[in-house]
């Protein structure tokens, strides 16, 4: 498989009198998002992000399946995860399955960040040796994710608890996911408010005991 690197360079902090911090960059954007805490109280967190390249293709939603190249780092810039090849494993189901907690669902900050990007208009191409080549016209962004939009107090293999995260993402392709294959995109079967809190309608909640939200229930269209 072809090796892929995220080569965009970003200055994260002031390192000299002539190097400005990214947090003073006028292009830095912010997204306010609410999260329920352990007491079921909404707490607001801020996702900061920088769009390095908007992308030329399809817009993305938080309920899509996306093909991405990414690099995940801690604040000391140590890398805890990254894509190194082009393969089917680069496809990620952003929202996943809330009933089974399907592993493919992503952390809030990653999901909301990728949704700010457009995909490539050209897509992957085949090299003569059979490997895949990623296009260069997909959206590229850097996302600064507070722990409340990440893993919070749950440590991961290379991520200590309460760690803010940095993700650099290149979006190659996006698909409007239809998790229950009922012909209606999943994004149209959930409700997201202005601060990113999702509610999951259940059209037949009083009729059966399946306890499936509409986006996972083919009987709800």
Please provide the spans of the model-predicted regions.
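Cross-family detector of peptidyl-prolyl cis-trans isomerase
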Residues: 1-221
